[in-house]
């Protein structure tokens, strides 16, 4: 049985994304990273959404691997510093670091999370998500805001089962339906 300790997160390249995309849909929400007109294309997946800022403000995209060979890539996660203001977080631990957006507490935005199609329905998504949250918390980040484009009931229930809470729905970029859900430092 696979455990979260069997995996590690390493920086991801566009070649890694294409290697996974060539094996089929793998992401919640589903997207085709090879198409420029897809709402979540490669450019969005790598989340260069903070132009003219220091490199530290660009997203970090990770691959979850058991070994380093491309065929062993199981999941991807794309993370950016959050531009949202979450308001006052009164129980903020003293060791929390600032993300550079003058928020009441540090937070990140999870823009894409996915598991390769042939590894789905084996519990890998849950393990990968728990490992990702562990990594974020070890970096003294308190809040994670997750964006779901084209919300699917399966995706929403998956994240809620892992402790996420729905915050709000809205139209996001060109009237694309979206949902934001949060998971908080515990």
Located regions from the model:
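Short amphipathic alpha-helix that is part of the acyltransferase structural core
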Residues: 2-56, 61-66
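Short hydrophobic/aromatic beta-strand element in the GNAT-like acyltransferase core
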Residues: 59-65, 76, 107, 112, ...
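Conserved acetyl-CoA pyrophosphate-binding loop and the N-cap/start of the following alpha-helix
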Residues: 119-131
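Conserved active-site tyrosine of GNAT-family acetyltransferases
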Residues: 159-160
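C-terminal "cap" of GNAT-fold acetyltransferases
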Residues: 143-154, 169-186
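Residue-level recognition of the GNAT/N-acetyltransferase active site
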Residues: 111, 116, 152
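Conserved acyl-donor/pantetheine-binding loop and adjacent beta-alpha core of acyl/acetyltransferases
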Residues: 70-112, 120
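Conserved GNAT acetyl-CoA-binding A-motif
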Residues: 129, 134-151
């Amino acid at each position: 049985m696979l455990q979260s300790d069997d995996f590690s997160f390493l920086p991801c390249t566009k070649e890694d994304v294409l290697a996974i995309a060539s094996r089929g849909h793998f992401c919640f929400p589903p997207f085709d990273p090879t198409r420029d007109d897809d709402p979540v294309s490669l450019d969005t997946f790598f989340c260069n959404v903070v132009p003219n800022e220091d490199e530290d403000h660009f997203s970090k995209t990770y691959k979850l691997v058991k070994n380093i060979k491309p065929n062993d890539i199981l999941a991807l996660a794309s993370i950016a510093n959050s531009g949202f203001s979450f308001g006052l977080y009164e129980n903020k631990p003293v060791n929390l670091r600032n993300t550079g957006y003058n928020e009441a507490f540090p937070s990140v935005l999870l823009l894409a999370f996915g598991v390769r199609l042939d590894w789905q329905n084996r519990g890998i998504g849950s393990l990968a998500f728990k490992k990702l949250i562990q990594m974020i918390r070890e970096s003294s980040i308190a809040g994670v805001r997750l964006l779901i484009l084209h919300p699917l009931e399966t995706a929403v229930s998956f994240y809620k089962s892992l402790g996420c809470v729905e915050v709000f729905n809205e139209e996001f970029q060109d009237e694309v339906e979206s949902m934001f859900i949060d998971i908080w430092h515990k």
